[in-house]
Structures are given as structure tokens and as C-alpha cells.
């Protein structure tokens, strides 16, 4: 059994993680924080979550249980300062922010418009996509959970296996997200459900912080000096879910059936589902689940991949729970199936 402390448990991903943890009995939530909700019980704030009614929100500065695994569901600037403190105190840490994903400080500070004062800790973090880095995650003390958009693009491309060596240095990714994937709590009405009702628009064109993350992890060790990723996110008039369309070219037209390659890559993966046609991919198949659905179609040397996931689960809290399970030697699927 692992004891879990969640900083930022009152936010969207923090609440989702609490819901997932309530489905299992191996891990115990012993400490939750929210500066806005400090002093309130979990039962007062989220009566639908069946945890002990005396579990109470603390401020972020409150001392946490010494043996607990710490999950940071807080803004980037808070994670930058908090993660090193907890690591140096002997805690295992999972960070859901983007603070420790990128390995180039200049690129990070441009993408996030934020000075990184603890950049030496980036190299201590394992990028938390279990289907790619499972063995490293089993021995990790510090995990940087991937972005929701990033997961929907990086993982499908990675699963192409031997075809990745033939990638041309340009990928176009077009992603549509529910409002909870784009700052659902912001006071900007344009990012609220009422702001997107009967509406549809792009945002952060050529400036979204997940674009360099996608670029770094898709082209890692490729030898390509200047690969290009063009990533465009859009806001859908729905609450949760991401559907991504990824267009890439290979330097050859002679290669194996990409559906067969994906199926072979995923044959032992509990949360990856390969569908026969891209038209079958849709949000309702993945909402409220930890599944990532993928399909692909080939024309000449061009591949069009379509993927879908729930941004709050496989794109955030569910993937974090996969990582908690791996880091603590627990069955990976624990808490992730109803």
C-alpha cells in the first residue's frame, strides 16, 4: 500500500485523481491541499467522492506525511519550487504540470513564459508515458506526467515502431479538445462551456506549450537537426475529450500495413485500442476511461493517424495513476477500470 498526498486536489485533475483512487483499496489518500479550499472537508467540496468524511483540505504550505508519494496537480510555477523540495526530503513525486518535461531551458521559458529556477532537476524526471517508458517508471523517484495533447500525438506516432526511422522532419497535428483540456477554470469566458456553446475555434496557434514537447519526444534520437512540428489546438463545445489528427510523411512508399504495425505494438497494452478505420475514432468511446483509441490510413508515403482520449484521465489523472501503480510495484491497471 502507498500513502498518497495530492497538492491541488481541488482542481480538475486533482478531483479526477481522487475519483480514480476511490475505486481501489491499495493506495490511501492521506493528505490533500488547496489554498482556496483549506479548512473544508472533502465531503463538503466533493460529496460524490466516497473517501473518509474527515479528510480535510490543507494549504499548500502545510506539512505532509513523511512517507507519502506526492502528486503535484498545481500550476507550473508552484511545481518548479515544490518538486525539488519534496524530492530532497525523500518523497517520490509525480508532477502533472509542464515544469519538468522539456530538456532545453530556453525552449521551456519561451513556451511557458516562465523563468525556471530549478532546471537541474529536469534530468532527474522520467517522462510518464507508461507504454513507452514502463521499465524506467518502475524505478523512478520523479515522474513528469505528459501533457494531454502531447499524449494523443506522441504515443500513436511512437507505436509505429520501425516506421519512425523513415519519418520526414515535419509533422502536422490538429487537435480538438473539450474545455477542460484548455483551462476550464479560467475566468476568460472564451474557455468556459458557455463560451464555446454553438461555437468552434482554434487557439494558441504556433505557440501552444505542448508543441515543443511533441517535437522533443517524437524526434528524440532521430538524428534530425531541425525537425518541425506544426500543432494547432481547437476548442470543442464539449466538456472532456481530445481528438487528434496527425499527418506525417515517410521517405518511402514501401512499408508494411500500418494498422498491423499498430496492432502488434499494442497487443499487450491494456489501455490502447486500435480500430480498423479512422472514421471509427470518436470521443464518446473514450470519455470517462483511460483508453487511447488509434487508427491510421495510408496514401502513398503519407500516413493520417486519428487518436482520441479523455484529457482528464489518460491525458492526466489516469496516466498519473498508471505511474503511481508502476512506481509502487502495484498492478498497473489498479483503479483504472470501473
Curated annotation (Swiss-Prot):
Pathway: Amino-acid biosynthesis; L-arginine biosynthesis; N(2)-acetyl-L-ornithine from L-glutamate: step 3/4. The keyword Lipid biosynthesis does not apply. GO terms for cellular component: cytoplasm. Its EC number is 1.2.1.38. PROSITE patterns: ARGC. The active site is at residue 148. Pfam families: Semialdhyde_dh, Semialdhyde_dhC_1. GO terms for molecular function: N-acetyl-gamma-glutamyl-phosphate reductase activity; NAD binding; NADP+ binding. It is found in: Cytoplasm. InterPro entries: AGPR_AS, AGPR_type-1, NAD(P)-bd_dom_sf, NAGSA_dehydrogenase, Semialdehyde_DH_NAD-bd. Keywords: Amino-acid biosynthesis, Arginine biosynthesis, Cytoplasm, NADP, Oxidoreductase. Transmembrane segments: none annotated. One of its GO terms (biological process) is L-arginine biosynthetic process. Its main location: cytoplasm. It comes from the Bacteria. Gene3D superfamilies: Dihydrodipicolinate Reductase, domain 2, NAD(P)-binding Rossmann-like Domain. It catalyses: N-acetyl-L-glutamate 5-semialdehyde + phosphate + NADP(+) = N-acetyl-L-glutamyl 5-phosphate + NADPH + H(+). Belongs to the NAGSA dehydrogenase family. Type 1 subfamily. Catalyzes the NADPH-dependent reduction of N-acetyl-5-glutamyl phosphate to yield N-acetyl-L-glutamate 5-semialdehyde. NCBIfam families: argC. This is N-acetyl-gamma-glutamyl-phosphate reductase. It comes from Leptospira borgpetersenii serovar Hardjo-bovis (strain JB197).
Amino acid at each position: 500500500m502507498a500513502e498518497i498526498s495530492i497538492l491541488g486536489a481541488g482542481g480538475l485533475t486533482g478531483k479526477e485523481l481522487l475519483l480514480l483512487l476511490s475505486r481501489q483499496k491499495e493506495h490511501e489518500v492521506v493528505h490533500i491541499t488547496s489554498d482556496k479550499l483549506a479548512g473544508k472537508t472533502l465531503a463538503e467540496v466533493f460529496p460524490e467522492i466516497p473517501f473518509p468524511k474527515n479528510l480535510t483540505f490543507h494549504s499548500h504550505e502545510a506539512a505532509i506525511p513523511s512517507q507519502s508519494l506526492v502528486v503535484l496537480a498545481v500550476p507550473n510555477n508552484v511545481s518548479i519550487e515544490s518538486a525539488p523540495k519534496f524530492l530532497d526530503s525523500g518523497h517520490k513525486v509525480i508532477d502533472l504540470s509542464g515544469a519538468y518535461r522539456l530538456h532545453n531551458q530556453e525552449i521551456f521559458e519561451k513556451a511557458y513564459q516562465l523563468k525556471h529556477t530549478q532546471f537541474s532537476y529536469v534530468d532527474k524526471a522520467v517522462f510518464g508515458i507508461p507504454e513507452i517508458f514502463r521499465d524506467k517508471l518502475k524505478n523512478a523517484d520523479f515522474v513528469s506526467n505528459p501533457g494531454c495533447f502531447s499524449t494523443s500525438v506522441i504515443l500513436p506516432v511512437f507505436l509505429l515502431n520501425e516506421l519512425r526511422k523513415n519519418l520526414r522532419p515535419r509533422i502536422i497535428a490538429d487537435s480538438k479538445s473539450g474545455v477542460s483540456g484548455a483551462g476550464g477554470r479560467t475566468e476568460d469566458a472564451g474557455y468556459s462551456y458557455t463560451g464555446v456553446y454553438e461555437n468552434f475555434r482554434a487557439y494558441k496557434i504556433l505557440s501552444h506549450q505542448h508543441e515543443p514537447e511533441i517535437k522533443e519526444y517524437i524526434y528524440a534520437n532521430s538524428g534530425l537537426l531541425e525537425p518541425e512540428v506544426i500543432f494547432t489546438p481547437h476548442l470543442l463545445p464539449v466538456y472532456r475529450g481530445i481528438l487528434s489528427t496527425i499527418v506525417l510523411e515517410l521517405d518511402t512508399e514501401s512499408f508494411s500495413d500500418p494498422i498491423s504495425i499498430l496492432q502488434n505494438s499494442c497487443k499487450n497494452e491494456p489501455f490502447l485500442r486500435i480500430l480498423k478505420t479512422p472514421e471509427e475514432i470518436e470521443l464518446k468511446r473514450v470519455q470517462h476511461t483511460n483508453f487511447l483509441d488509434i487508427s491510421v490510413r495510408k496514401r502513398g508515403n503519407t500516413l493520417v493517424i486519428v487518436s482520441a482520449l479523455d484529457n482528464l484521465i489518460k491525458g492526466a489523472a489516469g496516466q498519473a495513476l498508471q505511474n503511481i501503480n508502476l512506481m509502487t510495484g502495484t498492478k498497473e491497471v489498479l483503479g483504472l477500470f470501473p
